[in-house]
Amino acid sequence: MMIKIFDSVKREKVEFIPLKKGEVSLYVCGPTVYDDSHLGHARSAIAFDLLRRLMEFEGYRVRFVKNFTDIDDKIIKKSLESGEEIGAITERYITSYLEDMQKLGIKRPDIEPRATESLDLMWEMIQSLLQKGIAYQTPRGDIYLDVKQDPSYGKLSGRGEDLEQVSRIESSEEKRDPRDFALWKSYKGQSDVGYESPFGRGRPGWHIECSAMIEKHLAKEGDYAIDIHAGGSDLLFPHHENEACQTRCATGRELAKYWMHNGFVTINGEKMSKSLGNSFFVKDALRVYDGEVLRFYLLSTHYRMGLNFSEEDLLASKKRLDRLYRLKKRVGEGEVGAPSEKFLERLLEGLRDDMNISRALSAMDEMLTLSNEELDSSPKERALQATIRGNLEVLERLLGIGAKSPILYFQMGVSPEEKEKIEELIKERAEAKKAKDFARADEIRKSLSDQGIALLDTPSGTLWERA
């Protein structure tokens, strides 16, 4: 068993070797909770949910931490504009995010810390950096890290000299170098938020928050704090570069052995961004598409590639997922056997190669085709049915798809009001059959069929699905 992942530092695929045998520590940057989550958040969550599932399937004990940034300029701005307390805003959007992730089939992280819960550790790290002369406090009370003190600055992103980009993000006349970044922001008055600290009233910089939460919940002794740090490629610089820098300077070790980054989601070729006004919120998408279909669509492009949102491609993904559920419906419930060795080998070959989803889904498609052919030849062979159920269970465990009952899957897209009308007609049809009014029963079946609804009579009653 060898898993290869693309390491952003080495800029190539490398063999994953854990810091401790049989264990994986994984940290993924979570959202800044000032608004609902968009498809960019969803894609990142799905990408590293797949990584976690693969590691767990391979027998690793994964300790997965994903944070919430609950203090930030954007949150403060929203509070000032709306008059709503910051705590109420962040609580609402944390709940909203978790609801969205649940509908997308994302496994909950082991720990979901909030930045404000780790202020004491942030202070310790900042104090250490000040004592070492790596950080400095300005007359206004802001504290910056002096990046010239870190010879390795820029190693992660390859953009250590990108002065224009850094100064645009965080400019200040009091910086010694435009690349210096804030560890602590002094309190600026009533339009700001402040916490009492050893350095005066203020609040943490964005980057120090993640370093502190990693130290608190995941860090191990040794050359690296954790195995894998992951997130969107938009975070590579300056956020991840600055995280790596401050941890290296404060602790004397590297933050992560491996860094992984997923590609952007674009709309009409532009990166999805709330600031650009082109965010496609997950909640908006879920009003139109089932969460599992959306998951499968976002999963179907390799995680490092950009994904330009396309309704046509999404519908193609649904048809592909339909095939899986039609096979699941065909074999029905029953004994779950061991999966086909050939199928499992091909599936894992793809996923072990930096989560090559194209190869993995090709293995899935071949399995679906072969399974249907074998069922055509031997429709009642129980051993075959058990193997197919085993194959489907593997897809559920690894890819997070196929967990629904086929009936529920094929009912998606029907509104609650429509469902109620369909159930009423099914009840009326049952009463007509009981009264031997078969003409009326057939009339109801045909009426529903004309609306795209197929009826399935079973020993336990009549079921229905969208045809």
From Swiss-Prot:
Binds 1 zinc ion per subunit. It catalyses: tRNA(Cys) + L-cysteine + ATP = L-cysteinyl-tRNA(Cys) + AMP + diphosphate. Keywords: Aminoacyl-tRNA synthetase, ATP-binding, Cytoplasm, Ligase, Metal-binding, Nucleotide-binding, Protein biosynthesis, Zinc. GO terms for cellular component: cytosol. ATP binds at residue 274. It is an enzyme of class 6 (ligase). Its main location: cytoplasm. Residues 158-174 have a biased composition (Basic and acidic residues). Transmembrane segments: none annotated. It is found in: Cytoplasm. A motif ('HIGH' region) lies at residues 31-41. SUPFAM superfamilies: Anticodon-binding domain of a subclass of class I aminoacyl-tRNA synthetases (SSF47323), Nucleotidylyl transferase (SSF52374). InterPro entries: Cys-tRNA-ligase (IPR015803), Cys-tRNA/MSH_ligase (IPR024909), CysS_C (IPR056411), Rossmann-like_a/b/a_fold (IPR014729), tRNA-synt_1_cat_dom (IPR032678), tRNAsynth_Ia_anticodon-bd (IPR009080). A motif ('KMSKS' region) lies at residues 271-275. Residues 155-174 are annotated as: Disordered. One of its GO terms (biological process) is cysteinyl-tRNA aminoacylation. Belongs to the class-I aminoacyl-tRNA synthetase family. Monomer. This is Cysteine--tRNA ligase.
